[in-house]
């Protein structure tokens, strides 16, 4: 995060000045030249203490009070209720359950979840006991064209003794809605799933789930993924490297490979639903990281509603915030994190990078633009708003985030902000958008990783001219 060094010395050998280097969470590097060494150490200690606050209620969002803005704007977003309202218009086979009221069944789930109407709350509670963290299978997406669904959960607690749970089996069978088969996408290798079984976890036994077939599509996670981000950020800041050496360091970081695998796995889930006409369950271990990466990207591929500004915000609310992605520990130090932060992992940044790849491949399909994605990436790591605080809805309830902080969505949906975050050439596309994962199709997100090196003046001029030519200011919703 920071370091200090001497810049000069007096004749008696004592340091007379110093430099504090701040490596910020938005990837900026700031150097403070301080003439007095004692003051240098004071600044360093203060920044170190303020950057490592353990008490959530002492974070900046609790003290941020912009002029003219009232607390409560943008809160609450009834995302799950609105999602269910739209679902209800398509089918009556699913219900909105409050089995998790007061977070008493699963601490990382929201209070309301969507489940098959044929499954009682008692069944859900028993199924929860069979899943890691009690994250039982819930509906993530309903495909209106063929009525197939996308589900997510955590791994089953099969263990070395091959435990089973009839209620969990009943829940997954009910989700098929009479279909004769479904696919389970496990985001671990087969070997990792076997090792997890020896520790009490595992994956679904085909004898107990005969209608479900398991695919292992491993995605990097945890420290390995964080290390990849650290390497790509390090390469971007080594501006003295020659082109070939820089490209070799970029390749060695494996960041672009992780993007490829994420898009490929999400594309598989979407293909199973759209083209194969089958239901899909996605899980890894906890079901709070790569599981959410796959389900959210799959919805972006399939659903035009998720590609609008508001729809994308709802997607993040539903599939990341309310679904229990632990932002507080995963987004603690960004690309400068070191080994001390064992829980750091850039799953959400990887998701946003994949979204940017889709905006490149389908420049008219998304209503939001690159600046919108960069803004979200920045606020996920460091923000004056409370939207990305805490690790779950339960924690946000405990700390009264909605009552005591401002909402990022409320700020972004203000017209003065929103007009800079939308795509001037957006045209709604009702079809699925299938990403290419060919090597030439995946690029480094320069607008994020190199934004403090590459001049943006010409890009901004081009954006402004595109707005003028497209007449976007006169479209409905932009008045």
Model segments located where?
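Cys-dependent protein tyrosine phosphatase-like superfamily
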Residues: 1-280, 296-479
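Glycine-rich nucleophile elbow surrounding the catalytic serine of serine-hydrolase chemistry
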Residues: 285-299
């Amino acid at each position: 995060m920071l370091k200090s060094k001497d810049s000069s010395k007096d004749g008696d050998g004592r340091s007379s000045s110093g430099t504090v280097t701040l490596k910020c969470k938005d990837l900026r590097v700031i150097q403070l030249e301080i003439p007095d060494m004692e003051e240098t150490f004071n600044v360093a200690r203060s920044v170190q203490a303020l950057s490592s606050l353990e008490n959530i209620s002492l974070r900046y969002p609790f003290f941020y009070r912009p002029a003219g803005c009232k607390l409560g704007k943008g809160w609450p977003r009834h995302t799950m209720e609105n999602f269910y309202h739209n679902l209800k218009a398509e089918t009556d086979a699913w219900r909105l359950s409050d089995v998790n009221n007061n977070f008493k069944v699963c601490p990382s789930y929201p209070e309301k979840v969507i489940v098959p109407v044929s499954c009682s709350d008692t069944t859900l509670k028993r199924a929860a006991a069979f899943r890691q963290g009690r994250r039982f299978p819930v509906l993530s997406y309903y495909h209106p064209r063929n009525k197939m669904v996308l589900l997510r959960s955590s791994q089953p607690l099969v263990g070395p003794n091959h435990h089973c749970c009839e209620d969990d089996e009943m829940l997954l069978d009910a989700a098929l809605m009479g279909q004769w088969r479904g696919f389970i996408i496990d985001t671990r290798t087969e070997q990792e799933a076997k090792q997890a079984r020896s520790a009490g976890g595992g994956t679904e036994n085909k004898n107990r789930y005969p209608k479900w077939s398991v695919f292992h599509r491993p995605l990097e996670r945890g420290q390995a993924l964080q290390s990849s981000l650290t390497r790509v950020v390090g390469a971007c800041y080594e501006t003295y490297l020659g082109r070939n050496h820089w490209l070799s360091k970029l390749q060695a970081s494996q960041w672009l490979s992780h993007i490829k695998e994420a898009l490929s796995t999400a594309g598989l889930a979407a293909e199973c639903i759209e083209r194969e006409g089958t239901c899909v369950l996605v899980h890894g271990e906890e079901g709070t990281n790569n599981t959410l990466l796959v389900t959210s990207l799959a919805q972006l591929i399939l659903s035009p509603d998720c590609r609008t500004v508001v729809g994308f915000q709802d997607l993040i609310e539903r599939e990341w915030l309310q679904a229990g992605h632990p932002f507080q520990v995963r987004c603690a130090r960004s690309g400068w994190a070191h080994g001390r932060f064992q829980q750091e992992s850039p799953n959400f940044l990887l998701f946003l990078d994949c979204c940017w790849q889709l905006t490149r491949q389908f420049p008219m399909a998304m209503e939001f633009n690159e600046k919108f994605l960069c803004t979200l990436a920045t606020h996920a790591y460091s923000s004056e708003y409370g939207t990305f605080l805490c690790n779950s809805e339960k924690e946000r309830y405990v700390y009264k985030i909605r009552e005591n902080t401002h909402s990022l969505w409320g700020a972004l949906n203000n017209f003065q902000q929103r007009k800079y975050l939308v795509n001037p050439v957006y045209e709604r596309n009702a079809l699925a958008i299938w990403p290419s994962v060919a090597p030439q199709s995946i690029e480094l997100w320069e607008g994020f990783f190199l934004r403090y090196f590459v001049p943006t003046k010409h890009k901004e001029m081009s954006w402004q001219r595109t707005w003028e030519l497209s007449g976007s200011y006169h479209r409905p919703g932009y008045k």
